[in-house]
Amino acid sequence: MIKTTPHKIVILMGILLSPSVFATDINVEFTATVKATTCNITLTGNNVTNDGNNNYTLRIPKMGLDKIANKTTESQADFKLVASGCSSGISWIDTTLTGNASSSSPKLIIPQSGDSSSTTSNIGMGFKKRTTDDATFLKPNSAEKIRWSTDEMQPDKGLEMTVALRETDAGQGVPGNFRALATFNFIYQ
């Protein structure tokens, strides 16, 4: 139980009623201590480029619409999210995804409507752990997450992922250039 003595209350009231309390400028100096760092996350893989500001581009080679419609391996690309420099106190990493989700296929991210560089229609991209099926696509803008295993958190391993181009409406895909933005978010514990 905290006991408050009367003289402390008087001092507090004197401070609260002082004209200096109503000043328009307040400067605060403080010292913060960071107890644990997080991790540096990079994206690696064939056809992956980094612009130097941790913005990555993954290019999937040109293919026919039939490859996307038939969900062949040519319509997807593998990459890894690699964690390095993690604090020893980090026991897990969760990954979530944000992007412009398709209304008809909410697990697929589609191009922004104002992006004139993307000329496809009814095509989106989905993200999943490598070697899993399309039912495991990570739903953007949701609480769905992928929790990294202890092994995947090692700098020489990483979280192996696949991005796949798929029709948002079966049989309705229109070929062209595809460009969409996905943002991976990381939560550490």
UniProtKB/Swiss-Prot annotation:
Keywords: Fimbrium, Signal. Residues 1-23 form the signal peptide. It holds the Pfam family Fimbrial. Residues 113-123 have a biased composition (Polar residues). GO terms for cellular component: pilus. Coiled coil: none annotated. Residues 104-125 are annotated as: Disordered. It is found in: Fimbrium. The keyword Signal applies. Gene3D superfamilies: Fimbrial-type adhesion domain. This is Uncharacterized fimbrial-like protein YadM. It comes from Escherichia coli (strain K12).
